[in-house]
């Protein structure tokens, strides 16, 4: 009986530990790769990862109609921290997203974070179900 009680205590101790380590991983996998709005917008290419696990990062695109790339970055940092995830900016740029014409133009750079790899951004957009049939062009 003492052995069973001992195993029960081990199980109770292990549950919070497992929950701690699996929750950020699950959140990282559920994280949408693309979150952009319609119209002329600024965007960032972000690497999201579990602290200390940069090898298993997920690259995401985030873009909104805002005056500054910083607004996008800090809003995403706060959201990812709530999930136990870390964020690193890979650069930014601008987009013209015309959803009615199914066209997206990617161009420009970000003064704060530098230019994003627009071809990587295009690849991520085309991999999403919403934008896979869009005509996406990259300006130099």
UniProtKB/Swiss-Prot annotation:
Domain of life of the organism encoding this protein: Eukaryota
Cited Gene3D superfamilies: Janus/Ocnus
Binding, substrate: 42, 110-112
GO cellular component, one term: cytosol
Coiled-coil blocks: none
Organism lineage string: Eukaryota, Metazoa, Ecdysozoa, Arthropoda, Hexapoda
Active site location: 69
Annotated function: JanA and janB regulate somatic sex differentiation.
Keywords: Differentiation, Sexual differentiation
Name under which the protein is recorded: Sex-regulated protein janus-B
Pfam families with a match to the protein in the record: Ocnus
GO annotation (BP), single: cell differentiation
Similarity comment: family membership: Belongs to the janus family.
Recorded GO MF terms: protein histidine phosphatase activity
């Amino acid at each position: 009986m003492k052995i069973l009680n001992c195993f029960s205590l081990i199980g109770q101790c292990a549950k919070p530990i497992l929950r701690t380590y699996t929750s950020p991983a699950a959140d990282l996998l559920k994280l949408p790769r693309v979150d952009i709005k319609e119209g002329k917008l600024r965007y960032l290419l972000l690497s999201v990862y579990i602290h200390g696990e940069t090898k298993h990062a997920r690259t995401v695109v985030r873009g909104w109609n805002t005056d500054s790339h910083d607004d996008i970055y800090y809003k995403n940092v706060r959201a990812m921290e709530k999930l136990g995830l870390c964020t690193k900016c890979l650069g930014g740029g601008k987009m013209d997203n015309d959803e009615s014409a199914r066209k997206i133009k990617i161009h420009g750079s970000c003064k704060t974070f530098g230019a994003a790899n627009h071809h990587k951004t295009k690849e991520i957009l085309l991999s999403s179900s919403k934008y896979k049939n869009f005509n996406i062009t990259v300006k130099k």
